[in-house]
UniProtKB/Swiss-Prot annotation:
Uptake is inhibited by the proton ionophore nigericin, which dissipates the proton gradient, and by the potassium ionophore valinomycin, which dissipates the membrane potential. Residues 1-17, 75-81, 126-141, 191-241, 298-314, 355-373, 424-430 are cytoplasmic. Belongs to the major facilitator superfamily. Phthalate permease family. Disruption phenotype: Deletion mutant cannot grow on D-galactonate. D-galactonate binds at Y29, R32, Y64, W358. It is a multi-pass membrane protein. Residues 40-50, 101-103, 165-168, 268-276, 334-336, 396-400 are periplasmic. Major conformational changes and local movement around the substrate site occur to accommodate substrate for transport. Active transport requires reversible protonation of both Asp-31 and Glu-118. It catalyses: D-galactonate(in) + H(+)(in) = D-galactonate(out) + H(+)(out). This is D-galactonate transporter. The exact stoichiometry of cotransport is not determined and could be greater than 1. The gene is dgoT. Induction: Part of the dgoRKADT operon, which encodes proteins for the metabolism of D-galactonate. Negatively regulated by DgoR. Expression is induced in the presence of D-galactonate.
Length: 430
């Protein structure tokens, strides 16, 4: 595509918005990971079994997934500023209260509430990037904010462990929840849609708009202009192209949730690696994924600047990343810890490289239904978060981890094929 050239220098106000999204993603994922950090101490204090702890872990994923579509609908009605303020404030309060939980049921309830309020997060990110960035910069923007999830997991988990050891597990939730509450107030004070933002130049607005950015797409819909959803709207949301993207997101999320849930157990129980060594080995794949997601956005936008079509530039990193992720099953054929770590790091690098899937949602979704489409997209990812812990657990219990890794590889392959066979040309639906 042609990159617009303006006589006036466009300015860089949009990058402040991108940094704000990145910080929010870091907070979002730290508030997901804090329970894993504190789980052993919680089990000991409350006498919770591993099976019961499984219910606590899954409470987030179930409600997070179920609220994706309602969250997207709400986003389309009120816009990003209000949606994200309510979401960040809500999940942060629920996180803080987890530090005062009194037992199993209160933990389950509070984790479920956390999932409800986190549901609109990534549809909101997608809507903002669509409004703030031209097409040829969008993949890099998505890659940058998506990397926040790996920063939170790879770099901040040791800090949470230190807080727990210095104080108690309660403070893991109090600190992370308190930071989120403060950030929600900063967000509401600072963020505005592009046209309402102070300090943004007309040249930058023109640059974004001329490059395909929807500079008016992040404003809340006026009450009198709101339209009820119709059967035609739902048909557009489940267009063949978008179904291909949804399947791809299920595949990307499936690999991610294997690493979030079963990877440490795989190392210690299946491969007999010591807990200390496994702790180091779990960090390496997250760092590899962090590199992968940053590199994918850069590669996608570079291809656009080199004259390749938008569809080719966006789909190539996703397809390649999903195919690379299939190498995870190679760990079935070695017991060497270094080789296992390399294969797992390569697979998770591929997962990170494929994680710019959101950039295609912003290019394919019907303009009036970006939030709803993002909700369905994230719903598909949430299904991966629900099914992988269950399927891998069942396979590992009955047959060992080898068929579980084959399952993860097969899902990644299906995801790659969905982009090749279903998505086709990247053109906005409707």
């Amino acid at each position: 595509m042609d990159i617009p050239v303006n006589a006036a220098k466009p300015g860089r106000r949009r990058y402040l918005t991108l940094v704000m999204i990145f910080i929010t993603v870091v907070i979002c994922y730290v508030d997901r990971a804090n329970l894993a950090v504190a789980s052993a101490h919680i089990q000991e204090e409350f006498g919770i079994t591993k099976a019961e702890m499984g219910y606590v872990f899954s409470a987030f994923a179930w409600l997070y997934t179920l609220c994706q579509i309602p969250g997207g609908w709400f986003l389309d009605r009120v816009g990003s500023r209000v949606t994200y303020f309510i979401a960040i404030f809500g999940w942060s309060v629920a996180t803080l209260f987890q530090g005062f939980a009194t037992g199993l049921m209160s933990l389950i309830g509070l984790r479920a509430i956390t999932g409800i309020f986190e549901a609109p997060a990534f549809p909101t990110n997608n809507r903002m990037v669509t409004s703030w960035f031209p097409e040829h910069e969008r993949a890099s923007a998505v890659g940058f904010y998506t990397s926040g999830q790996f920063v939170g997991l790879a770099f901040l988990t040791p800090l949470l462990i230190w807080i727990q050891e210095m104080l108690s597990w309660h403070w893991v939730f109090i600190v992370t929840g308190g930071i989120g509450i403060i950030w929600s107030l900063i967000w509401f004070k600072v963020y505005q849609p592009p046209r309402l933002t102070k300090g943004i130049s007309k040249a930058e607005l023109d640059y974004i708009r001329d490059g395909g950015g929807l500079v008016d797409g992040d404003a809340p819909v006026k009450k009198e202009a709101r339209q009820p959803l119709t059967a035609k709207d739902w048909k557009l949301v489940f267009h063949r192209k978008l179904i291909g993207v949804y399947l791809g997101q299920f595949a990307v999320a499936s690999t991610l949730w294997f690493f979030l849930t079963w990877f440490p157990n795989y190392l210690t129980q299946e491969k007999g690696i010591t807990a200390l060594k496994a702790g180091f080995m779990t960090t390496v794949p997250f760092l590899a994924a962090f590199v992968g997601v940053l590199l994918s956005g850069w590669v996608a936008d570079l291809l656009v600047r080199k004259g390749f079509s938008l569809g080719f530039a966006r789909k190539t990193p996703i397809i390649c990343g999903l195919l690379i992720s299939t190498c995870i099953m190679g760990a079935n054929y070695t017991n060497d810890p270094m080789m296992i770590m390399c294969l797992m790091a390569l697979a998770f690098f591929g997962n990170g490289f494929a994680s710019i899937t959101w950039s295609l949602v912003s290019s394919l979704a019907p303009m009036r239904l970006i939030g709803l489409t993002g909700g369905v997209f994230n719903f598909a990812g949430g299904l991966g978060g629900i099914t992988v812990p269950l399927v891998v657990g069942y396979l590992a219990q009955g047959y060992g981890f080898a068929p579980a890794l084959v399952y993860i590889s097969a899902v990644a392959l299906i995801g790659a094929l969905s982009y090749i066979l279903l998505v086709g040309d990247v053109k906005r639906v409707g």
